Amino acid sequence: MNTDYIALAKAFLVKQRLCQTCGIVCNYGLSLALRKPLVHFYPPILMLEPTNICNLHCPLCLTGNGKLLRPKGMMSLSLFQKICREVQDKIGMLILWNQGEPFLNPDFYAMLEFAAKQKFYTMTSTNASLELNIERLVKSGLHKIIISMDGITAETYNKYRINGNFELVLKNMQDLVLMKEKLHSSKPYIVWQFLIMKHNENEIEEVQKMAKELKIDKLEFKTTQIYSSEDITFLPSNHKYSRYLQEGNIFTLKTKVKNRCRRLWTQPVINWDGEMNICCYDKNGSIKIGNIQEHSFSELWWGEKMQKMRKEVLINRAKYDICRNCGEGIVQKIKTVKSER
């Protein structure tokens, strides 16, 4: 049985967390049926941003291409601990990334260790193009790590991961697998994420072989998000690997933007400075909810601004730019390959 699923189940098999999760799922279903936002429970998931600073310059990332408008910084360990303590009995999963490279935060290992003591299920995403303390990482209690590497050669990888180090990323993945074996640890569950673009779509078959050889737990292929007609050149030639319909310089999502969004019921975001976002697609924090340093989580979660947003997406979600380019409801992970162990 998948050890990652077991770890996830354990995190939620706590009375209050389980009740909260079941309750909010029912709330969401009723909200869709009644077209009225009903929220009487906490979300099961919380995304926390350790930092919005990155060491790479990926051209389709707002942080990497310099178009992120928010102030840059790193979440303090004290703020992280404050948030965790406030929601530890209600929320089961912490997603520890947003706009930035989490391991650039010098307190990140301590954050992982603290979250483990609070019995959260934790997952993070990294470019792994920096020196990692592999032993401490495996011992930290982190449940899942997503490593982004979009190529099986340095030449392919460097076309998108500007300023990245292919050899270092590969070494970190290999060392992580070996350290897990050495310490007889099932954690963290290692996911190799491969963003499909025009320049690497020809490597899809080979990367599956490579992932199995490296004993990676799971390989995930993901579609690419673009923001302007200038970005179309990154889209793969094979349209089944794209989330967009394309006609010349015009691109639209393959699926209709429906008047619903589970993330507003299940997965809020708190940025490095304490500002709450409605979701991770609001990368610049354009929709202001409030700051966790000035309000409690419950005040923000059940506050007027969040309720107003929930009501509006049930009526006309397409009015928001971020929603019109959102992958919600689209199968973004085209294919997954699990390693045979």
Where do the protein language model's features map onto the residues?
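Short cysteine clusters
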Residues: 54, 58-61, 261, 279-280, ...
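Short, basic and Ser/Thr-rich N-terminal targeting/leader segments
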Residues: 44, 263-264, 319
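Conserved alpha-helical substructure of the radical SAM core
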Residues: 2-144, 155, 159, 167, ...
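A short, charged
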Residues: 314-325
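Radical SAM enzyme [4Fe-4S]-AdoMet core and its adjacent flexible, acidic
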Residues: 1-12, 49, 70, 75-78, ...
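Small disulfide-bonded, cysteine-rich extracellular recognition modules and tandem repeats
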Residues: 22, 64, 264, 326-329
